[in-house]
Amino acid sequence: MPDESQDTPVLDTIAAMTAVSVAECDLAPDALLLVRLAALAAVDARPVSYLLHIGPAAEAGLTIEDAQNVLVAVAPIIGTARVMSAALNIAEALELAIAVIEEDSE
């Protein structure tokens, strides 16, 4: 039987990098997630990248208003197109998260 980690080498690498980053960072969880949200917006991340942060953000007590404030703060730096793309991608990630929760509750 093949090793499961060999089935998802890209995801495994991303998970390992994220774990090291979180372990080595001295920011509070809410601040860390806000910084990561800003970085995702800056690189025009896809919805799945935001989706991976929804659970931890909720656990840290962050709100959609916090996400909006981050986008307002970075807008002059990353530009309107990236901010609008981030807003759409966050909305798509939230829709997917809600769909998964609804499916799991049935």
Residue map of PLM features:
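Short basic/hydrophobic patches in alpha-helices and adjacent helix-turn junctions
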Residues: 56-60, 73-76
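Beta-strand segments within the central parallel beta-sheet cores of soluble alpha/beta enzyme folds
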Residues: 34, 68-72
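Winged helix-turn-helix DNA-binding recognition segment
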Residues: 62-66
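Acidic, glycine/proline-rich low-complexity segments that act as flexible tails and inter-domain linkers
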Residues: 1-34, 42-44, 50-59, 82-106
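A short structural micro-motif
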Residues: 40-41, 73-80
